[in-house]
A protein has these predicted regions:
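Conserved, mostly hydrophobic/aromatic
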Residues: 18, 26-28, 51, 93, ...
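Structural motif corresponding to the early beta-alpha repeats
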Residues: 29-152, 156, 163-164
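Catalytic beta/alpha-barrel core
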Residues: 6-7, 198
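Alpha-helix termination/capping residues and helix-transition junctions
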Residues: 20, 95, 200-203
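Acidic/histidine-rich catalytic cores of soluble enzymes
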Residues: 135-205
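N-terminal ordered "arm"
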Residues: 12-35
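Hydrophobic faces of well-ordered beta-strands that scaffold small-molecule active sites
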Residues: 1-5, 24-28, 58-63, 101-103, ...
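Alpha-helical scaffolding within the catalytic cores
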Residues: 9-14, 194
Length: 205
C-alpha cells in the first residue's frame, strides 16, 4: 500500500507536514498559471523537483488542467489544440515515471456542493449537496448524448498514448452523481455508466 496525499504547487508546508507523519507519495495538481508550460519537460522537472526535494514521490496527476480539458469535454472550438497538449501531458508523465492519471468527464461544472458548512457530529462542519439549491452560473447547455460522444472521441485518442507511455487511466465518477446540473448533463453517475465507459473505450490492463 502507498499512503499518499493531494498537493498543489503552493502547498509547500502541507507536503512537509505530510512527510513528517509518514506520507511518502503525492497526488499532484498541475499548475495552471500562465508562466507554466504544460508541454515543457523543463517546467515539469522544476515543478516535480519541489516535491522530490521534500521526499514526496509523485504517483498520480489529478485532474487534467481544466482550462484545456473542459474544451474537450464540451467539444468547444480549440478542442484539437487542447488534445495535442493533453497528449503531451501523458507523454511527460511517462518520461517522469508518474504511473497514473486520474481524470473525470464532468463537463462545464466540476465537483460541486451547495453547502460548505453542513453541521456534522461534535460541532464539526462538512459539505453537502441538495439539487433544489443549485443555481446555474450561466446558460451553457450540453446533453448527455453530446458528452458521451465527446468522451468516446477523447478516449479514442488518449488511450493509445497512455498505452505507449505506460500510464494508467483512472476514471472519477461525477460528483454529485445527478443526471444534470441545470442544463448541463452528467453521465458517470452509476456503476452501469462507469462500466460502459471502461469497457467501451479503455483498454484492459
Amino acid at each position: 500500500m502507498q499512503i499518499a496525499d493531494y498537493f498543489t504547487e503552493q502547498d509547500t508546508m502541507g507536503r512537509r507536514r505530510a512527510k513528517q507523519v509518514g506520507v511518502n507519495y503525492g497526488v499532484l495538481r498541475l499548475p495552471e498559471r500562465s508562466g507554466f508550460d504544460l508541454t515543457s519537460a523543463e517546467h515539469w522537472n522544476a515543478y516535480l523537483d519541489g516535491f522530490r526535494s521534500d521526499g514526496i514521490i509523485p504517483v498520480v496527476i489529478e485532474p487534467l488542467p481544466n482550462g484545456l480539458y473542459d474544451t474537450v469535454k464540451c467539444g468547444l472550438p480549440g478542442r484539437d489544440e487542447a488534445m495535442y497538449k493533453l497528449k503531451k501531458i501523458v507523454a511527460l508523465m511517462g518520461r517522469f515515471h508518474i504511473p497514473t492519471l486520474c481524470l473525470n468527464f464532468m463537463a462545464h461544472v466540476g465537483w460541486y456542493r451547495s453547502r460548505q458548512n453542513y453541521p456534522l457530529r461534535g460541532g464539526a462542519l462538512g459539505t453537502a449537496f441538495d439539487i433544489k439549491d443549485y443555481v446555474p452560473a450561466d446558460d451553457f447547455a450540453i446533453t448527455q448524448e453530446q458528452i458521451w460522444a465527446n468522451m468516446e472521441s477523447f478516449f479514442r485518442e488518449i488511450v493509445p498514448v497512455a498505452e505507449k507511455y505506460q500510464v494508467r487511466l483512472a476514471l472519477h465518477p461525477d460528483d454529485p452523481p445527478v443526471p444534470a446540473l441545470g442544463n448541463v448533463g452528467r453521465v458517470l453517475t452509476s456503476l452501469q455508466s462507469i462500466d460502459r465507459a471502461v469497457t467501451s473505450w479503455i483498454a484492459p490492463c
